[in-house]
From Swiss-Prot:
InterPro entries noted in UniProt: CcO_II, CcO_II-like_C, CcO_II_C, Copper_CuA, Cupredoxin, Cyt_c_oxidase_su2_TM_dom, Cyt_c_oxidase_su2_TM_sf
GO MF terms held by the record: copper ion binding; cytochrome-c oxidase activity
Name under which the protein is recorded: Cytochrome c oxidase subunit 2
GO cellular component terms, semicolon-separated: mitochondrial inner membrane
Pfam families the UniProt entry points to: COX2, COX2_TM
Family indicated by similarity: Belongs to the cytochrome c oxidase subunit 2 family.
Residue intervals on the Mitochondrial intermembrane side: 1-38, 104-247
Enzyme class label: translocase
Residue positions binding Cu cation A2: 217, 219, 221, 225
Domain of life: Eukaryota
Assembly description: Component of the cytochrome c oxidase (complex IV, CIV), a multisubunit enzyme composed of a catalytic core of 3 subunits and several supernumerary subunits. The complex exists as a monomer or a dimer and forms supercomplexes (SCs) in the inner mitochondrial membrane with ubiquinol-cytochrome c oxidoreductase (cytochrome b-c1 complex, complex III, CIII).
TM region(s), chain numbering: 39-55, 87-103
Stretches of the chain forming a coiled coil according to its record: none
Length: 247
């Protein structure tokens, strides 16, 4: 029982009636969650302040309609409702810009994975690894139909070939499309990047824990848009190299 309480229960998949983010697996996603919590706190403070002011105005005027008969202006209040929101916006803006530029930075990646969206599946290419034929390692990933799912597999999320990545390794994802606009979205990794035909977008990720992460195409791309799940497995480097040798 004590061991069960000591273990962390990680949420890396969408859950019914979920009200919060999936658990973070990268520094970028950790920063997004922290920024969200801070902004939500500021919004609650502002909501409480505005609610108090409205309540105060309604109760005072209800007691006496002549309460502010001789009040022409209030310099202190004018200064407060200008300075207070400005300071709050600055406290939200600075962390937001820092996180934005941090997420856009691609730091000397140890390996690159190219993801190409097609109607309606994903094609992946490991540009740093070669197969026996001398070509770069690549494979296609399709959603497993509901009637072929095995015990433990997730409906509309599991695929026949998942992406395997090593943990604690700087990864670069290069995303494009072969037909219409798609979107490569992995909530636990803090990744959401457009896959546009004729354009090669890039983003980075540093997975800090082992796990299986799920995502989906987040751009309406046709009748089978919901059939483009993404599955990434983060494994130790030794297991990753063994998986590469098997391909």
């Amino acid at each position: 029982m004590r061991e069960m309480m000591m273990n962390n229960m990680l949420n890396d998949v969408p859950t019914p009636w979920a009200m919060y983010f999936q658990d973070s697996a990268t520094p970028n996603m950790e920063g997004m969650m922290e920024l969200h919590n801070n902004v939500l706190f500021y919004l609650c403070v502002m909501l409480g302040f505005v609610t108090y002011m409205l309540y105060n105005v309604m109760t005072v005027y209800n007691k006496s309609a002549m309460a502010y008969k001789y009040m022409n202006h209030g310099q202190f209040m004018e200064m407060m409702w200008t300075t207070f929101p400005a300071m709050m916006l600055l406290m939200m803006a600075f962390p937001s810009f820092m996180l934005l530029y941090m997420c856009d930075e691609v730091m000397a990646p140890a390996m690159t994975i190219k993801a190409m969206g097609l109607q309606w599946y994903w094609k992946y290419e490991y540009s740093d690894f070669m197969v026996e034929k001398g070509e770069t390692m690549e494979f296609e990933s399709y959603m497993i139909p509901e009637d072929l799912l095995e015990d433990g597999q997730l409906r509309m999320l599991d695929v026949d070939a998942s992406v395997v990545c090593p943990v604690d390794t700087h990864m670069r994802f290069m995303v494009t499309s072969a037909d219409v606009i798609h979107d490569f979205c992995m909530p636990s990794l803090g990744i959401k990047i457009d896959a546009a035909p004729g354009r090669l977008n890039q983003t980075s990720a540093l997975m800090q824990r082992e796990g299986v992460y799920y995502g989906q195409c987040s751009e309406l791309c046709g009748v089978m848009h919901s059939s483009m799940p993404i599955k990434i497995e983060a494994v130790p480097t030794v297991d990753f190299l063994a998986w590469i040798d098997e391909q």
